[in-house]
Amino acid sequence: MPRKSTFLAWILRMPLIKRWALMFCVKPENIAEHSHQVAIVAHLLAVIKNKKFQGNINPDRVATIALYHEASETRYGDIVSPTKYANAEIAREFKKIEYLAEKECLDSLPEEFQDIFADIIVQDNV
């Protein structure tokens, strides 16, 4: 019997993870909202690059990567930038943690889909 996938649990947890924990926000934002907004802006920028500057970028791929770019935060939450980038050594360690979470998220998919999503979820592959 195939192993059960928990991938959707990772993704559907995104609205529960709040961003900007140390900042006052008029309207609290979660990583699902953030990822959606980033996907829209990224898609538009790719279209502009192609139409105005003779680019050769796939806007759909750019938008897809943007939708998943914070998936690892469903494991450890949103780490605030002043902490994450306090110095180069700390930043490297946080990137390692994010990589482990990205791999865990990827491993939550059935094996037959992992090759497709590896290039979307694992930041080192993007």
Q: How would you name each of these model-derived features?
A:
Residues 4-22:
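Short alpha-helical hairpin
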Residues 38-42, 98-107:
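An active-site-proximal "capping" alpha-helix that borders the catalytic cofactor pocket
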Residues 46-50, 72-83, 109-118:
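Membrane-helix exit/interface motif
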Residues 20-26, 32-35, 51, 67, ...:
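Acidic/histidine-enriched, beta-strand-rich ligand/metal-binding domains
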Residues 27-60:
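Alpha-helical phosphate/pyrophosphate-handling elements in metalloenzyme active cores
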Residues 57-63, 107-126:
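Histidine/acidic-rich helix-loop-helix segments that form or flank divalent-metal centers
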Residues 40-46, 60-79:
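Active-site alpha-helical segments that house and flank conserved acidic catalytic motifs
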